[in-house]
């Protein structure tokens, strides 16, 4: 640190008497200086020290001045007890007084409130207030200072107390110095730094100590002993340094922690005041003898560099070591002035005023940044330069070099002929390092630490400023006093070249032939003997490692990444590929690597090209180089062919084609142009009209047309090249039916594969006629049948099957399945039958039936079971070996059909809100179903639902006894929760009814006229004669029908013919009524006289032996058959192998209708109504027209 005087002035009054300067203040922009001298306020221009104007207004000595932070006004305080406010235009605008002389003034940096302090009080004035608020104090105030945020004012007192007040003047903190009244506080100042978290107050007292306190009153660090009485303490603008002046007649520079760094401008009298110019390194001081001096402080750079580690001084007392590659930094706090720094490998030497510290790295890691103290030499040294080695330090003093061990013992000394201008460690074994020394007389020496003799390398005419030696120690670069860079060959001492405008030079540590030098605002890079490459760069080059150049600009060291492109291209121009590769390894861009690789490839230096392509990870070119190397191993040495491949890869196709031709490989040129779709150029290389090559070319041209989305052109080209399959695929994919038709008709029927492809696309495009035509052309009848089936063109399929019966299964089975899917079961059945697949028909129907039951479609289930039964009957007729099993299934399915048909009504009654059935019908249905159910109910049929329906209808119709019995039976079953309440309620309420049934409801047997119970253990047969009841299939009332059987020997045909004869007999109906007329009245009388009785042979056959448990059927002979009327006989004409069933109506007046397909009996009125509703039989769903036939 040096203090350079800028200007000095001596202040006198008119009588030439010296005027003491008690205070100074800078205008915030630094252009003006306000001086308190005698009883005047002087205003100076800081640039040259000229006085702008003296301000008069005070009548006595001016003790203090202060400038507002906004630069609009300043204040002065005097021994005349007054404070004057001045504007920046140097006009006085306000004056106010205290009771005692004014000791100090200070402006609030935020609110611009002015604090003025006297011996007995302090006042606070602001422009907004008319009056000044004053506060009494117990001791004389000597100094004051506001915090940065303007919230608190610190007052320094004569009794050794620091009082910290808020903006309103109230005391918040009181700091008492140990010396008390013997240590008056003479100057205080808050640190203006914005980086510190705490406000720090510097306190200087006349106990000759400098102390630091936080706002809370807590002391920071220990008291610093000054050795003189301090009169003024002041901070630099950023708070990094403090200046203190006083009785030692000089200004001293301290760190912000109070470490003394050195003196600034020694004077002849006490220095009462000192201030730092805002945001600069200028200091002004005011003395007792009227001296006003303005100094510039120059902080020299103290630093050291070794390869990528740079150490420099910070805040005068700290050393920062920076790793230039990783940008890591470490701070070493020395707490003393750092004078010199040296760094070498893992060693760091720091010289302080009274000692030298040697540090070493904590570990061997190249990126380690942890230093620890290795040795300490407690001795004062005076030296110009300091160098550190592995086990020694070297001190340079003018012409002398001294070598000391780390213990401080002098081991060796060298005396030079001239002043030493430059010294550098150039490496070597530990304890035997070499040093490069440059002298003022131009001599350059090499010194080894363990050798007392210096070796002269060379001597030049001009003085040395900078030196560096190349990596292999063969070349030496020197910068002389004329800023010329000279490069010598150390062996021959020859000057290799020289370059102007250099202030520093450095060889590349990784490349022998590269160096860089800086000067004139430019960075110059020189490779071998090539011209210098320049780029703009401010500062000094101090190191060059690979592609990084270490540059020192003012105080900061930076690593500049410099692409080595320019020198690399210089080598490339001369086809020096290997040297260019070495340069590229130092650091070039990917584009430069690619350029190097391409140039080397074209120069057929495959080794260099391969390395370069590996760098840019270009696999295509690496494959090419690999293939060329393989071919070379096989003895292929045609460089033209290799170069042609290279040009082809680079896209230089015409050059490649010429080289292929030159090498006699026209076919390669043809392949290349073909692959590139450059068909016009390819045609030039077609041989002597080889049709194979021509066809290949057209095919590839078509492929290209296809890829560029010109498919029609491509298809036409495929056709002309004979690639029919590709043309068909392209046409089919784009739906061009016209082109497909044209191709299919042109193709020969022997070309089966393309024709089948055409047919496939016709099918896909829904042009089935053309597909059929194509299949006919190739005679593929099976495919044609499949086409008809897939498109459901059944008529054409049947016509084809008639001519070709072997395809019967191919048509009828899919047809039957299609019919079944469309609920056309009868037709499906026929189709299955035609295909001979009765088992399939049964399986499909069984599945449909099961689904209907699961989905609670019981009506459909009944219908499907009836269909199944008829299917089984059909099978039993055709296959005798299965007859018994099928007949058994027939009866089972007939029974199930009847059960589901009945349960449909019960299900609807229990699960739907409304029922279309009468109570009597539901009553009959539920009884019928209950009697028909065996122990195990069929899937889906609920016994609870059946009993619940019967119970409700019994109660409604007056069959209370039956209802009670049914409710009791329900108690033994698991009842769903939805019925539980209703059933429990019904069970209770039925007990209020009489325990008997309505006689109207009791069923009667028409054979034996026996009344039957409602709940019959035998089922739907008479308990007396065991005759099976015949029910109406709609209302399930018992019909007046009795089944009879034919005597042995009477065939069905004969029986029908005998009944049809209908022998004449008197009508019992006509004979039983008598008509009588008398006067105006007509009377009909039913007369049951004996003469009315006629004999009926069938009635006699109804009798049976009472008390027998076996059923005795009614068997009739020919005579009885002759007596029967045809309209009284109903015949169920079952197909074989079943026998016909005969029924005789005992009440001819009751009209009964039987469905001719399912043979279910109905009351005629019910049947007609149901047929009108559904247009079919309600049981078997045969359309009415079909039924009537």
Curated annotation (Swiss-Prot):
It holds the Pfam family TPR_IFT122. One of its GO terms (cellular component) is cytoplasm. One of its GO terms (biological process) is intraciliary retrograde transport. PROSITE patterns: WD_REPEATS_2 (PS50082), WD_REPEATS_REGION (PS50294). The keyword Repeat applies. It is found in: Cell projection, Cilium; Cytoplasm, Cytoskeleton, Cilium basal body. WD repeats lie at residues 16-54, 57-97, 99-135, 137-175, 180-223, 225-264, 266-306, 459-498. The keyword Repeat applies. Keywords: Cell projection, Cilium, Cilium biogenesis/degradation, Cytoplasm, Cytoskeleton, Developmental protein, Repeat, WD repeat. Component of the IFT complex A (IFT-A) complex. Required for cilia formation during embryonal development. Acts as a negative regulator of Shh signaling. This is Intraflagellar transport protein 122 homolog. It comes from Xenopus tropicalis.
């Amino acid at each position: 640190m040096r203090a350079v005087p800028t200007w000095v002035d001596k202040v006198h009054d008119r009588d030439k008497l010296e005027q003491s300067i008690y205070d100074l203040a800078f205008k915030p922009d630094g252009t003006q200086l306000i001086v308190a001298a005698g009883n005047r306020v002087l205003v100076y221009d800081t640039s040259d020290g000229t006085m702008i104007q003296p301000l008069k207004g005070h009548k006595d000595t001016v003790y203090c001045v202060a400038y507002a932070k906004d630069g609009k006004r300043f204040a002065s305080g005097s021994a005349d007890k007054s404070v004057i406010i001045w504007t920046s235009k140097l006009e006085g605008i306000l004056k106010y007084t205290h009771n005692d002389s004014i000791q100090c003034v200070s402006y609030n940096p935020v609110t611009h409130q002015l604090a003025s302090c006297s011996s007995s009080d302090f006042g606070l004035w602001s422009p907004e207030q008319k009056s000044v608020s004053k506060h009494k104090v117990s001791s004389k105030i000597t100094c004051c200072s506001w915090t940065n945020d303007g919230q608190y004012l610190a007052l320094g007192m004569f009794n050794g107390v620091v009082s910290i007040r808020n903006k309103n003047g109230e005391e918040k903190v009181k700091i008492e110095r140990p010396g008390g009244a013997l240590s008056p506080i003479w100057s205080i100042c808050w640190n203006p730094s914005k980086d510190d978290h705490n406000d720090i107050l510097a306190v200087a007292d006349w106990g000759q100590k400098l102390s630091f306190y936080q706002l809370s009153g807590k002391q920071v660090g220990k008291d610093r002993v000054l050795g003189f009485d301090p009169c003024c303490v002041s901070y630099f603008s950023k708070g990094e340094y403090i200046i203190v002046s006083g009785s030692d007649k000089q200004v001293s520079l301290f760190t912000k922690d109070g470490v003394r760094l050195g003196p600034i401008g020694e004077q002849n009298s006490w220095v009462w005041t000192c201030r730092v110019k805002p945001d600069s390194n200028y200091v002004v001081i005011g003395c007792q003898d009227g001296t006003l001096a303005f100094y510039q402080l120059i902080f020299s750079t103290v630093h050291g560099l070794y390869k990528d580690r740079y150490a420099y001084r910070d805040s005068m007392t700290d050393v920062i070591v920076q790793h230039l590659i990783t940008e890591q930094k470490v701070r070493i706090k020395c707490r003393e002035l750092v004078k010199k720094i040296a760094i070498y490998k893992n060693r760091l030497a720091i010289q302080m005023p009274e000692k030298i510290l040697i540090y070493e790295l904590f570990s061997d890691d190249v990126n380690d940044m942890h230093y620890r103290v290795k040795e300490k030499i407690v001795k004062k040294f005076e030296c110009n330069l300091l160098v550190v080695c592995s086990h020694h330090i070297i001190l340079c003093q003018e012409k002398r070099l001294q070598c000391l061990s780390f213990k401080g013992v002098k081991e060796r000394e060298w005396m030079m002929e001239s002043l030493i201008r430059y010294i550098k460690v150039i490496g070597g074994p530990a304890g035997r390092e070499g040093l490069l020394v440059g002298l003022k007389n131009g001599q350059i020496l090499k010194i080894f630490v363990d050798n007392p003799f210096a070796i002269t390398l060379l001597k030049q005419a001009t003085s040395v400023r900078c030196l560096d030696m190349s990596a292999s120690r063969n070349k030496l670069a020197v910068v002389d006093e004329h800023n010329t860079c000279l490069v010598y060959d150390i062996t021959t001492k020859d000057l290799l070249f020289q370059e102007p405008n250099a202030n520093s030079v450095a060889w590349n540590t990784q490349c022998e032939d590269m160096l860089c030098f800086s000067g004139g605002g430019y960075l110059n890079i020189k490779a071998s003997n090539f011209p210098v490459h320049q780029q703009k760069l401010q500062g000094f080059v101090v190191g060059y490692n690979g592609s990084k150049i270490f540059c020192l600009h003012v105080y900061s060291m930076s690593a500049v990444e410099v692409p080595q492109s320019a020198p690399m291209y210089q080598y490339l121009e001369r086809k020096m590929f290997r040297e260019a590769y070495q340069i590229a390894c130092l650091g070039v861009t990917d584009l430069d690597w690619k350029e190097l690789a391409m140039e080397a490839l074209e120069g057929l230096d495959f080794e260099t090209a391969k390395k370069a392509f590996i760098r840019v990870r270009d696999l295509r070119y690496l494959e090419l180089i690999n293939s060329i190397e393989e071919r070379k191993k096989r003895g292929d040495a045609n460089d033209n062919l290799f170069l042609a491949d290279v040009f082809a890869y680079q896209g230089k196709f015409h050059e490649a084609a010429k080289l292929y031709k030159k090498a006699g490989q026209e076919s390669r040129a043809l392949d290349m142009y073909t692959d590139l779709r450059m068909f016009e150029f390819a045609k030039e290389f077609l041989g002597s009209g080889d049709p194979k090559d021509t066809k290949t070319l057209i095919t590839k041209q078509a492929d290209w047309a296809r890829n560029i989305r010109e498919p029609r052109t491509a298809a036409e080209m495929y056709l002309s090249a004979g690639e029919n399959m590709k043309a068909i695929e392209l046409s089919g994919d784009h739906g061009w039916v016209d082109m497909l038709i044209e191709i299919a008709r042109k193709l020969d029927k022997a070309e089966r594969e393309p024709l089948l492809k055409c047919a496939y696309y016709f099918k896909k495009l829904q042009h089935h006629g053309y597909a059929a035509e194509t299949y006919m052309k190739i005679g593929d009848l099976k495919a044609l049948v499949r086409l008809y089936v897939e498109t459901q063109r059944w008529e054409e399929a049947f016509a084809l099957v008639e001519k070709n019966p072997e395809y019967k299964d191919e048509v009828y089975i899919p047809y039957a399945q299609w019919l079944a899917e469309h609920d056309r079961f009868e037709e499906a059945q026929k189709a299955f039958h035609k295909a001979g697949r009765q088992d399939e028909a049964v399986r499909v129907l069984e599945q449909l039936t099961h689904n209907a039951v699961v989905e609670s479609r019981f009506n459909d289930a009944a219908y499907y079971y009836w269909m199944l039964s008829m299917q089984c009957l059909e099978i039993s007729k055709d296959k005798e070996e299965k007859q018994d099993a099928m007949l058994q299934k027939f009866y089972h399915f007939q029974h199930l059909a009847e059960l589901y048909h009945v349960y449909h009504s019960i299900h609807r009654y229990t699960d739907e809100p409304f029922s279309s059935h009468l109570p009597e019908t539901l009553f009959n249905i539920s009884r019928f179903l209950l009697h028909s159910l065996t122990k195990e109910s069929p899937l889906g049929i609920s016994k609870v639902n059946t009993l619940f329906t019967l119970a409700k209808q019994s109660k409604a119709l007056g069959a209370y006894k039956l209802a009670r019995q049914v409710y009791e039976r329900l108690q033994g079953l698991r009842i769903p929760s939805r019925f539980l309440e209703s059933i429990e309620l019904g069970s209770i309420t039925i007990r209020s009814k009489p325990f008997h049934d309505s006689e109207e409801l009791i069923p009667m047997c028409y054979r034996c006229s026996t009344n039957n119970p409602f709940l019959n253990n035998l089922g739907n047969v008479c308990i007396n004669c065991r005759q099976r009841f015949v029910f109406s299939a709609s209302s399930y009332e018992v019909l007046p029908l009795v089944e009879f059987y034919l005597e042995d020997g009477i065939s069905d045909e004969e029986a029908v013919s005998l009944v049809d004869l209908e022998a004449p007999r008197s009508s019992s109906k006509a004979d039983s009524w008598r008509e009588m007329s008398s006067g105006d009245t007509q009377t009909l009388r039913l007369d049951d006289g004996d003469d009315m009785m006629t004999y009926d042979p069938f009635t006699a056959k109804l009798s049976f032996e009472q008390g027998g448990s076996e059923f005795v059927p009614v068997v009739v002979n020919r005579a009885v058959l002759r007596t029967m009327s045809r309209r009284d006989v109903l015949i169920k004409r079952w197909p074989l192998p079943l026998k016909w069933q005969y029924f005789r109506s005992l009440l001819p007046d009751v009209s009964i209708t039987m469905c001719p397909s399912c043979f279910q009996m109905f009351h005629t009125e019910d049947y007609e109504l149901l047929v009108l509703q559904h247009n079919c039989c309600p049981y078997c769903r045969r359309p009415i027209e079909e039924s009537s036939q």
